[in-house]
Amino acid sequence: MTLRNIPLIGMLSAVLLTVQVGLAFLPNVELISLLIIIYTLILNKKTIYIIITFVLLQGLLYGFGLWWVNYLYVWFVLAIITRIFKKETSPISWALISGFYGLSFGALCSIPYFFIGLSNGTLESGFNTAFAYWINGIPFDLVHGISNFFIALVLFKPIYKLLDYLYKKFNIVQ
């Protein structure tokens, strides 16, 4: 990481926060997933710093509640998935990955509830608590998955091309 990367990380984190706040009035419709996919494809490991900054900004803006614990890992899961499929070039592939990620978001976010349920003393209680949380959010996960799919299908290529162009134009060092 170079000194030159710090403003880049700050700006791209601010973009994540801005689009999140800007679309907050639409439940589970977001550009964060698509942007993290594109950031990971182009910026590789720098995305880690962008995610950390974004998550800290979210906590400062909205408070450090239980929802925030989810953010400590869910966006990193998406970055890891992106790294696994980094050879994919088709917008439809990324739309499917983004859509599936949106569908699974509630399941990923149910993990802390498993541990809360464990505090009642049994493994079954942990699973029941996490399962109840996940089932309760399925309508939101459906919206999240469908909107992620269409957002990525339409915007993946233009945003990827723009960020890749800027990355090369300003000779941002790996």
Q: Model-found features: residue ranges?
A:
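Hydrophobic transmembrane alpha-helices
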Residues: M1-I42, K46-T53
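Interfacial aromatic-anchored transmembrane helix boundaries in multi-pass membrane proteins
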Residues: L17-E30, T53-E88
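Alpha-helical transmembrane segments and their membrane-interface exit regions
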Residues: I36-L43, F76-I84, G102-L103
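Structural signal for the C-terminal ends of transmembrane alpha-helices
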Residues: L41-N44, I81-T89, K157-D164
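Central hydrophobic cores of alpha-helical transmembrane segments
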Residues: I48-G59, S93-L103
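Membrane-embedded alpha-helical hairpins and interfacial helices in multi-pass inner-membrane proteins
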Residues: W68-V69, S90-Q174
